Amino acid sequence: YMAKRILVTGAGGFIGGFIVAEALKRGYETWAAVRRTTNREFLQDERIHFIELDFTDELALKATLAQAIADNGGKWDYVVHNLGATKAANYLDFERINYGYMRLLVDTLKALDAVPEVFLLMSSLSVMGVGDDEGYTPFKITDDPVPNTRYGMSKAKAENYLKMVPGFPYTIFRCTGVYGPHERDYFLMMKSIASGFDFSVGFRKQMLTFIYVKDLATAVINALEAGPKRRAYFI
């Protein structure tokens, strides 16, 4: 039995660390793509293989990936692209990072003949745009995305690129609000609610959805093992 090999980009992030942990738990040979500056506080397991990928340098990225593939007996079985910007100083950064970096990774894997069994893109519910604030009907996966933020637009553009690559083995997760250990923003919100503050944005009823980070990490690995679906899922 050969252990499955997985590459997780954005491994130093909140969600990335939990995806790495779940992959290790299942016995995968687990590669964490990081930058030189990435905080590795939650990537302490000595079984992790680190690979420094510089998405701002196309040639260096290709060389690093090619070297890793050559040195380690072949391509990755699974790639989880969890790298993304949710906050950006300049709105152009959203497209450069969320669309541009993913496209570069896909194109490079193709060029190296290293397309995995499954490429899972961590996208976002924000590709859908504004919800129905009259009847509060939930989004259906068949609804057309109408993103209304630069962030949502950049994620939608990344999704569309995957769909256009002939036969590319992708699955897309449109993640909702993710909470859990090491996450700051929702934690502060929950603390204030717990201490008796109720707050909402605006004056309308709000329907928000959340997923616990460890459940999300489990779902990510399950989705890889289920094979490429060439479609998106809300999670």
What are these regions (language model features)?
Residues 132-177, 198-206:
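Catalytic helix-loop patch of NAD(P)-dependent Rossmann-fold dehydrogenases
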Residues 9, 33, 79-83, 119-125, ...:
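SDR active-site strand-loop-helix element
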Residues 103-150, 171:
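Conserved Rossmann-fold NAD(P)-dependent oxidoreductase catalytic core, especially the SDR/UDP-sugar
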Residues 128, 171-188:
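Flexible, glycine-rich beta-alpha linker
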Residues 53-104, 130:
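NAD(P)H-binding glycine-rich loop region in Rossmannoid oxidoreductase-like domains
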Residues 190-198, 207-235:
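Alpha-helical substrate-binding/gating segment
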Residues 6-26:
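N-terminal Rossmann NAD(P)H-binding glycine-rich loop of SDR-like oxidoreductase domains
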Residues 33-38, 55:
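N-terminal Rossmann-fold cofactor-binding loop
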